[in-house]
UniProtKB/Swiss-Prot annotation:
SUPFAM superfamilies linked: Winged helix' DNA-binding domain
Biased composition (Low complexity): 600-619, 640-649
Taxonomic lineage: Eukaryota, Viridiplantae, Streptophyta, Embryophyta, Tracheophyta
Protein name: La-related protein 1A
Annotated localization: Cytoplasm, P-body; Cytoplasm, Cytosol
Spans annotated as Disordered: 1-128, 366-428, 527-649
Compositional bias ranges of the Basic residues kind: 527-536, 574-592
Organism: Arabidopsis thaliana (Mouse-ear cress)
Amino acid sequence: MMAETEGSVADDRELITREGGIGTKSPWKTTTSPVETIDAPVMGAHSWPALADAAQQPRPKNPPAPAPAPPSKNIPTSIPIPTPAVTGQAKSKGGGKANPGHKNPSGRHSKPGPRSNQNGPPPPPYLVHAVPYHPPPFPPMVPLPHAAGPDFPYAPYPPYPVPVPPVTESGNEKQVQASPLPPVLPAPQGDPGKPWPHQRGFDPRNMPQGAGPRNFGRPPFMGPAPGFLVGPGPGFPGPVYYLPGPPPGAIRGPYPPRFAPYPVNQGPPILSPEKLDLRDRVLKQVEYYFSDENLENDHYLISLMDEEGWVPTKIIAGFKRVKAMTMDVDFIVYALGFSNSVEVQGDQIRKRDKWSDWIPASKKSTSAETIGDGDKDSPKSITSGDNFGNPSKGSSKPTVSDFSSEGAQSSRTNNYKSGNLKSSADEKRNVEDLSNDFSNTFLLDEELDLEHRSPRKSGLSMSKSIEYEDDDMAVDDQDIQKLVIVTQNSGKSDGAGIGGTEAKNIPKELASTINDGLYYFEQELKKKRSGRRKNNSHLDTKDGKIKSGEGLNTKLGENSAANDGGEEHGIITSRRKQNKGTHKHHTAHARRFFSSNIRNNGNISESPPSSSIGFFFGSTPPDSHGPRLSKLSSSPQCTLSGSSPPVGSLPKSFPPFQHPSHQLLEENGFKQEKYLKYRKRCLNERKKLGSGCSEEMNHLYRFWSYFLRDTFVLSMYDDFQKFALEDAAGNYDYGLECLFRFYSYGLEKHFDEDLYKDFEKLSLDFYHKGNLYGLEKYWAFHHYRGKEEPITKHPELEKLLKEEFRSIDDFRAKETITNQKENKSH
């Protein structure tokens, strides 16, 4: 800077000398007037160093200034002290006085270059002046400050550089300060230019309420432009600019943007060829189950359907063929999703089209047995605990409760009508898959013994066999020998089942399932029995082949079921005829299961049984106590005449099986026992404990009341009447009440003149003894018969019904008065 200043001064003096006509001289020899020396003294001039010394001294470090030039060879090493003239000029320059040479800057530009100090840097080609600062017409764009939340882990961006005008003036060695910037408002939060010395990790708990990291950064709002400076003119909107969104790094908000990748769509799972083959096989198997071809013969599957045709998927998964392929229920449901003939809903499946054609008759009947034994009466009936139903003749809404309780069977209609299910004697099932296991589960031990050990089958000819397809069927004592009782409470008289377990109440839905299971199982036994007869129509003998039943058609069963107990028939049996055994009844789809009724809505004289009971006709041949024996009976492998059977004296449990009824029977403690043995055990218990003290006898009364309504057996009816009257004589009326219910409902189903006369006689007799229950059932029988052919009434009974007992309320009022009198007497 010193050398440059020195060269400028020399050039100026040379210019002045030329303009004044003076020759070129060294400016160091020119003297100034004393006046200037006196007027413009320079402070500290005496302490100035020599020019040569000053040029050799290093300059202070100043990045904007260039390095000092080396001294010229023409300049002597020792430079004299500048004269006062030089001092005055320097003063004039430094004091701010105008230099005459600076008034015409154009002359300087015309110069080709300085003529002295050739080794110095050339002067700029133009005269440098300080550029004045003009503020922009709009406020400067100030970047948004860094607004960071608490515990924000990222450092703020550095401040944006702001351009400033030049800060130095040409020809002046003194540095000029930068022009001040427009005032900037302080940041709302913190100082954006000051980094945080200590920053903690990001803690989501310190996040401001209502704010949080966003998945995608929102681009800045691109609204209409602010308009032109002078306006585009009235009536025209400003232009709208649409710009692409900035890159993610340029978006600055209270939090850095977080970008989540788009989820990758994996698509449907790709099954292996083995899985695809398994899916097709499962689908084909289940579709076959629900095909019309299979349903025509598959009564078991039909029994599993509910009122809408649905079958639980778990049950289908438990079938042998399906279970052998897979036990994954979810995979089965997945496979059925590709079916066109089977539909899936939740955990149930059914036939897609025409499923209503295969609903079991017991679940789609239009006149279900929904009314209790006392449904002819008011639900307020207090005469019997079984009178809990509400009378509703001709109920049109069938429910599964039709087979759920003590009084669940209405005598208005018979739900089991022939033809409701497609079944016949010639129908055959796939015994390899279901029938064998299904039948073997229910066979008694003696049946299994005969099935597995005997190479030849018995050729005994039944005098009258049970043909379930016939609309009219004759049942006699011979058939009773094949009757099997299914009891829930056996061997105990305290209400607990076998082994001390309490009898469980059977829900309505499960009771219907058990009922259907017992019936269809009975059909399976019949088919197996028919198949055995065909295969063994001829037996090999030494003399040749003879018919197995030849000469053996002697009627068996002369020892009636009543004789097993050694009891004598006496009351109202003298006028019974043996043709009563040919009483015709339709039992093609008769009820097989009677669930317990634990509700007691009246002042019954005793507690009704709390356990359920059922039955089916087994295939066990009768005990060999007849005069003639078959070859099978005389075989060493079979029971000898007069000996006790090897098993069957005690109830047998049901092995577990996939059929729902089997599992329910096992879980609820049901046992199977031949009727004749069960009857004998009940009578022995009654004799031991006394009338009214045997719970098993109560079950037997209840069974008789239901069974005889559909299948009349004379010997069974005689037992029923005899023991009920004996208990009533001992002030125990449960058996008698069961008998009256049998009369009322049974006669409405199948009217019989002899039974009707017994009904009238017993009703009148017990009315005179103060018991209104028989008269009430007699009134209900006539009241609910409707407009059928009138029946002649007993004169005294007809008078009572016309004068005193015209409605059920009259019975309730009479019963209340009787109870009040009894309470006062006590």
